[in-house]
Curated annotation (Swiss-Prot):
Part of the phosphoribosylformylglycinamidine synthase complex involved in the purines biosynthetic pathway. Catalyzes the ATP-dependent conversion of formylglycinamide ribonucleotide (FGAR) and glutamine to yield formylglycinamidine ribonucleotide (FGAM) and glutamate. The FGAM synthase complex is composed of three subunits. PurQ produces an ammonia molecule by converting glutamine to glutamate. PurL transfers the ammonia molecule to FGAR to form FGAM in an ATP-dependent manner. It comes from Mesorhizobium japonicum (strain LMG 29417 / CECT 9101 / MAFF 303099). Keywords: ATP-binding, Cytoplasm, Glutamine amidotransferase, Hydrolase, Ligase, Nucleotide-binding, Purine biosynthesis. It is found in: Cytoplasm. GO terms for molecular function: ATP binding; glutaminase activity; phosphoribosylformylglycinamidine synthase activity. The lineage of its organism: Bacteria, Pseudomonadati, Pseudomonadota, Alphaproteobacteria, Hyphomicrobiales. GO terms for cellular component: cytoplasm. This is Phosphoribosylformylglycinamidine synthase subunit PurQ. Residues 3-222 form the Glutamine amidotransferase type-1 domain. The keyword Transferase does not apply. The gene is purQ. NCBIfam families: FGAM_synth_I, PRK03619.1. It holds the Pfam family GATase_5. One of its GO terms (biological process) is 'de novo' IMP biosynthetic process. It catalyses: N(2)-formyl-N(1)-(5-phospho-beta-D-ribosyl)glycinamide + L-glutamine + ATP + H2O = 2-formamido-N(1)-(5-O-phospho-beta-D-ribosyl)acetamidine + L-glutamate + ADP + phosphate + H(+); L-glutamine + H2O = L-glutamate + NH4(+).
Length: 222
């Protein structure tokens, strides 16, 4: 399975994502730069975490307006799988590929620790290797991960099963409404989440709870 990783100034988790995708798929992903207007034929596009363009204006606001994001949107519209992690999630929201907004953590502090995630919807390409209600571990590292959506949008997300990851009870690190940690679009091929599953894919790194997400997204057989 082929994958691509989007590179933008200020992103600093690209090597983590590249290493994870290489380890899981057996093939190094291609990389696409901010000015690229086309993305090769791939099965998965990943937007990693970091601080694109220094998080000026709003987290992800400048990155979302780069030429490469128009190419990402075109691929997503054709059904290509897209995943945005941390700043990648913020970029997807700013680009209009996912609804809602990501605000400053309620603590007003940068949060970096391991948390527990509940699989809210296991009937997606990203979560099909997990069990409904399963609780997994994942690192978080962000300052603006407080997910918010208006009442109508929130009701639609909850009602249509678009909330796929939720911070397990008592572990919400940022104040996200309804403990939301990750959502998908209506078509089910675009995922955004604040935690970093790419940092927990093998035992040598403390566990492999995040591995199944990428295996599912890449369509790797169990």
């Amino acid at each position: 399975m082929k994958s691509a990783v989007v590179l933008l100034p200020g992103l600093n988790r690209d090597r983590d994502m590249i290493a994870a995708l290489t380890k899981i798929s057996g093939k190094p992903p291609v990389t696409v730069w901010q000015t690229d207007t086309e993305i090769p034929d791939v099965d998965l596009i990943a937007i990693p975490g970091g601080f694109s363009f220094g998080d000026y204006l709003r987290c992800g606001a400048i990155a979302a307006r780069m030429p490469v994001m128009r190419a990402v949107a075109e691929k997503a519209a054709k059904g290509v799988t897209v995943i945005g992690v941390c700043n990648g999630f913020q970029i997807l929201v700013e680009a209009g590929l996912l609804p809602g907004a990501l605000m400053r953590n309620t603590s007003l502090k940068f949060v970096c620790r391991q948390i527990k995630l509940e699989i809210t919807n296991a009937n997606t390409m990203f979560t099909r290797r997990y069990q409904p209600g399963q609780v997994i571990r994942s690192p978080v590292a962000h300052h603006d991960g407080n997910y918010f959506a208006d009442a109508e949008t929130l009701a639609r997300l909850e009602g249509e099963g678009q909330v796929v990851f939720r911070y397990a009870e008592g572990t919400n690190p940022n104040g996200s409404i309804n403990d939301i940690a990750g959502i998908i679009n209506e078509q089910g091929n675009v995922l955004g989440l604040m935690p970093h599953p790419e940092n927990l894919i093998e035992a040598a790194h403390g566990g492999s709870d995040g591995r199944a997400l990428f295996e599912g997204a890449l369509g790797i057989a169990a």
